[in-house]
A protein has these predicted regions:
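Active-site bordering "gate/hinge" segments
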Residues: 1-216
Length: 216
């Protein structure tokens, strides 16, 4: 499994953000995956990146318990985090984020959860807008398996998280040692197809399968 996780981080860094020598890397990952820090550090060093800055995120149940209706503290925390990220926009930094696919929370705390999400939305928009102003900022967002997500998808499995990771590694190609090369070939093929379509200057395209019809 450790080898596959190394392959996965390799894909994230070399394909997702395509980190270059002497670049800063800002990584946002769930707190339950803090163990990936060692792999990020190792891979970044191999790719001659400058430094890795980490932000570990709690799930919503943890946040609701931690802040308990005192959401101004959470607001202040995200304000500080966002200010740090904004300062990195001018420092040749690339940004990688792995989010929880589905995040568990108590249904009875739905209103409190919405308050947390509104605070997050405010600072996410602030960072995104500033990133657009600066331009040419490389960032990559993805999802990462979690226990609750696995239980939702594989309710009959005895070890649903293991099953989800098995599928996830197949989809990301991290179960191949040459995953980066495979991804790059796929990207090149897509770019060649786009180039071909541009050259043909089609006025419209029609795509049809047994279940789908698409007209562009």
């Amino acid at each position: 499994m450790y080898k596959y996780l190394e392959n996965l981080v390799d894909v994230w860094l070399r394909v997702g953000v395509n980190i270059q020598p002497n670049q800063l890397l800002y990584v946002t990952i769930p707190s339950e995956y803090i163990s990936l820090k060692d792999i990020f550090d190792k891979k970044t060093k191999q790719l001659k990146g400058m430094e890795v800055i980490y932000q570990f995120t709690d799930d919503y149940d943890q946040l609701l318990e931690k802040y308990k209706n005192n959401y101004q503290i959470y607001d202040s925390y995200l304000s500080e985090i966002t200010s740090k990220k904004l300062s990195l926009l001018e420092q040749n930094c690339v940004f990688f984020e792995a989010k929880r696919g589905i995040d568990f929370f108590d249904e009875e705390k739905k209103q409190e959860l919405q308050q947390l999400k509104q605070i997050e939305k405010k600072y996410n928009l602030k960072f995104r807008n500033e990133k657009r102003k600066v331009g040419n900022i490389v960032s990559c967002k993805t999802v990462i398996p979690t226990k609750y997500w696995a239980e939702c998808i594989f309710p009959e499995e005895l070890r649903p998280l293991d099953k989800l990771w098995e599928v996830y590694l197949q989809i990301t190609l991290a179960n191949f040692d040459n995953a980066v090369e495979i991804w790059n070939r796929r990207i090149n093929e897509i770019q060649e197809r786009v180039k071909y379509l541009d050259q043909q200057q089609f006025k419209s395209l029609y795509f049809k399968t047994d279940k789908t019809q698409l007209y562009v």
